[in-house]
């Protein structure tokens, strides 16, 4: 079965920290995201999932495809195979629009902001570190 998903790498422009949720099933820290609903565009799903999983509203950062419908290009598309099928994830860099109290969704056990250095001390997939480095360098002019 094919699963189309969208996720947001939410980075605070002031602190350069990333917002991650600790996924209940995976028992790892991951970026907020989830399945794209029928009749929903990937960028809409990324915004919706971020709000559902964290309680904050976001603005996607990305190149806008020059068309009437104002399509935002994803930073990348991640693909992997699992027991439930093929997962295709549209990845978007984002910034928070509000910093109200974070909420933990039923799919997570924890939520938090992490610096790049802190990612070395928590259980994350290597892709999260690589993607955060890319976003910091290309969207926030952070040089390692």
Describe the predicted segments one by one:
Residues 1-17:
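Conserved N-terminal beta-strand and adjoining loop/helix that marks the start
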Residues 16-59, 65:
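Conserved Nudix-box catalytic region and its N-terminal flanking loop in Nudix hydrolases
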Residues 55-100:
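Active-site segment of metal-dependent pyrophosphate-handling enzymes
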Residues 133-144:
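Compositionally biased, intrinsically disordered linkers/stalks adjacent to structured regions
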Residues 91-93, 102-132:
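NUDIX/MutT-family hydrolases
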Residues 1-5, 24, 31, 83-89:
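Short connector loops at helix/strand junctions that flank enzyme active sites
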């Amino acid at each position: 079965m094919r699963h189309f998903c969208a996720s947001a790498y939410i980075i605070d422009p002031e602190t350069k920290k990333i917002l991650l949720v600790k996924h209940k099933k995976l028992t790892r820290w991951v970026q907020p995201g989830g399945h794209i609903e029928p009749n929903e565009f990937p960028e809409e799903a990324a915004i919706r999932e971020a709000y559902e999983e964290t309680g904050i509203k976001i603005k996607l950062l990305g190149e806008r495809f020059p068309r009437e419908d104002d399509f935002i290009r994803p930073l990348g598309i991640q693909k992997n195979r699992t027991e439930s099928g093929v997962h295709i994830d549209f990845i978007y860099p984002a910034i928070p629009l509000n910093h109200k109290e974070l909420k933990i969704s039923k799919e997570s056990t924890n939520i938090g902001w992490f610096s790049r250095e802190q990612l070395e001390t928590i259980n994350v997939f290597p892709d999260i570190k690589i993607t955060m480095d890319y976003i910091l360098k290309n969207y926030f002019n952070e040089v390692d």
